[in-house]
């Protein structure tokens, strides 16, 4: 019998799921449904090389087509493999609901897609600051998750950079450098901040939780990264929350605490113990990027009987699990009648490489790794074959380019209770450093800065035991 698989989500996870279904032997039709109008593309460049592409020469080429969405997409689009040439892509149409018992997806345009098996690959969306002030297009407030987000941010940066040309300064005396504020010092926030700094902007990073990437790196290494970025000219405002935006139609500043004016208090190179102290300040800004994390896109699965606590709860095979209150009919339909798997950022599953606690992993390697496992599971279920339990032990991996630093992370450093600097100097990250992360004496992760690629294999093998 020919079986139809629907994949909800047309990002990297959705694309890899389609490829892996074909590799596993699924010969039936596959339909990929995506909210964005673009074919699958590579997201990491959005905060780095694509964001900066040709903007350094904005004065020389202000009228070029570099900000055209089609041109931007071509630079990051994934090559379509022959194995998925017959896969149907329904793009620009969000999934709005799922009837797992009937095997049917509801789409925003009123159409429906029938399926015998479902892959959930709807990923994440960025969080927004819920504070008063200007909002919407033209407000100077940005997030960065999609290609359209990148194009909007690029256009705003281009306008600011052109305003900062020598000709513009001559026409308007006293014009400051473009002031970019990034709220959030995670990996995306730091990458955007470094990109803006490289374009000649005056950059401040505001982070209530502490030094950059604290949750993953640990305090010592996080402060070392902060010092490195401060030496490059970046300013940090730590331990303080944004409570509003100044400005009417467009942001002119961020309100921090009790409202004191700190326009003259911005001094690059805040103390290593916490950055610039601006409690109660209005921090001037021409443009703001909110990089405060993300949330799983699972609302469309409400009522489907699945456990949607922080993503889609799965077992180690990446089969979606029912919620505790699911009825017997829903449980049967969702778990056995019409098999459902989840991949990528939205999948929460146990990894025996570390422990039996289900977690979501927002790392670059996860869409590919989970797609391989989920496709094998789904194909086996549709064929009535056996699934090997607890055999999925992926090693998380990601990298982050920040100025002259390239960070490589292996394993799950965030699980550690102890961090050791195995080699290198915390005040010379650009010269190379390796930190190892341990939990109860067991190695669970490693982080390297500016390490030669020839060293990556040994770090991976050490974690695999």
Place the predicted regions along the sequence by residue.
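Beta1/beta-strand and adjacent pyrophosphate-binding region of the FAD-binding site
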Residues: 2-11, 174-186
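FAD-binding core/adjacent interface of flavoenzyme oxidoreductases
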Residues: 5, 75-179, 257-263, 267-269, ...
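Flexible, glycine-rich terminal cap/loop adjacent to redox cofactors
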Residues: 8-27, 33-36, 44, 49, ...
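Residue-level detector of alpha-helix initiation sites
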Residues: 11-15, 37, 124-126, 148, ...
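N-terminal Rossmann-like dinucleotide/flavin-binding domain of flavoprotein oxidoreductases
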Residues: 20-112, 218-235
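FAD-site-proximal beta/loop scaffold in flavoenzymes
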Residues: 136-172, 265, 269-270, 274-276, ...
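Rossmann-like dinucleotide-binding cores of NAD(P)H-dependent redox enzymes
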Residues: 168-171, 177-179, 187-244, 394-399
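Mid-to-C-terminal Rossmann-like scaffold of FAD/NAD(P)H-dependent oxidoreductases
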Residues: 348-454
């Amino acid at each position: 019998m020919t079986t139809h698989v629907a994949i909800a989500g047309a990002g990297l996870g959705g694309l890899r799921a389609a490829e892996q279904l074909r590799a596993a032997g699924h010969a039936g039709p596959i339909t990929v449904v995506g909210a964005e109008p673009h074919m699958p593309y590579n997201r990491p460049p959005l905060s780095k090389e694509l964001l900066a592409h040709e903007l350094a020469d904005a004065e020389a080429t202000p009228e070029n087509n570099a900000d055209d969405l089609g041109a931007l997409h071509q630079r990051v689009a994934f090559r379509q493999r022959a194995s998925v040439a017959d896969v149907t892509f329904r793009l620009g149409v969000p999934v709005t609901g799922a009837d797992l018992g009937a095997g049917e997806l509801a789409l925003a345009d009123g159409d429906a897609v029938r399926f015998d098996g479902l892959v959930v690959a709807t990923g994440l969306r960025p969080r927004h600051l819920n504070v008063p002030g200007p909002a919407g297009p033209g407000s100077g407030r940005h997030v960065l998750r999609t290609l359209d987000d990148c194009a909007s941010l690029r256009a705003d940066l281009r306008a600011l950079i052109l305003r900062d040309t020598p000709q513009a300064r001559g026409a308007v005396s006293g014009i400051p450098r473009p002031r970019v504020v990034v709220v959030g010092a995670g990996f995306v926030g730091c990458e955007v901040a470094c990109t803006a700094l490289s374009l000649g902007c005056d950059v401040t990073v505001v982070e209530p939780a502490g030094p950059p990437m604290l949750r993953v790196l640990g305090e010592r290494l996080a402060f070392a990264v902060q010092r490195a970025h401060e030496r490059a000219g970046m300013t940090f405002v730590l331990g303080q929350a944004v409570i509003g935006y100044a400005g009417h139609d467009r942001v002119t500043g961020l309100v921090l605490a009790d409202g004191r004016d700190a326009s003259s208090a911005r001094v690059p190179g805040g103390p290593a113990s916490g950055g610039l102290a601006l409690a109660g300040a209005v921090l001037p800004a021409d443009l703001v990027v909110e990089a405060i994390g993300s949330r799983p896109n699972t609302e469309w699965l409400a009522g489907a009987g699945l456990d949607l606590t922080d993503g889609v709860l799965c077992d180690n095979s990446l089969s979606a699990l029912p919620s505790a209150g699911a009825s017997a009919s829903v449980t049967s339909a969702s778990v056995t009648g019409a098999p459902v798997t989840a991949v990528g950022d939205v999948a929460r599953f146990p990894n025996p490489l570390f422990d039996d606690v289900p977690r979501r992993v927002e790392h670059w390697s996860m869409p590919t790794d989970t797609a391989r496992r989920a496709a094998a599971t789904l194909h086996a279920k549709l064929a009535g074959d056996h699934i090997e339990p607890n055999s999925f032990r992926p090693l998380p991996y990601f990298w982050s380019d920040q100025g002259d630093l390239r960070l490589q992370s292996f394993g799950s450093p965030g699980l550690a209770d102890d961090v050791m600097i195995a080699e290198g100097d915390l005040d010379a990250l650009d010269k190379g450093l390796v930190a190892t992360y341990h939990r109860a004496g067991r190695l669970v992760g490693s982080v390297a800065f500016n390490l030669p690629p020839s060293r990556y294999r040994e770090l991976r093998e050490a974690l695999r035991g």
